[in-house]
Amino acid sequence: MRKIIANRIITPDGTMLQSFSTHDFVKHTDANGKTYAVDGGLDYQRTFWHEDAPHTDACVYTTDPFTEIRQAFCWGSYGKDGKQPIHWKPLHTMTDEHIKAILETQHHIPWHIRGVFENELEYRHENNISIKDSE
């Protein structure tokens, strides 16, 4: 069964809205004057749109090519010390060390999200990509 990796829509004026977590309701008043919204994070997709000016569904799922998944998936981080405001980092920009730390410490994450991180490390190995910590 396919699972959501990135819950997002594109409004008629080209604005991308992305809901990162459950009940993360994100809205935008489009250039056409209509309000659009997306909600649900990786758990469900709820959108608010208009029949006469529809949005584009830009969701990414586990069944999509991994090259799309690694660009679209974002992980919320509170910084190394855990005291920073949450910052959503795209998977393809995360350091190797950060991904390994998530796999070693975040045992609560769903299997399909764990698989995304494992696949990213494999992708980097196969494509000779390494992102090191700057500190």
Give residue ranges: language-model regions:
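N-terminal accessory interaction module
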Residues: M1-E68
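Basic helix-extension-helix modules of the SAP/HeH family
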Residues: R70-E135
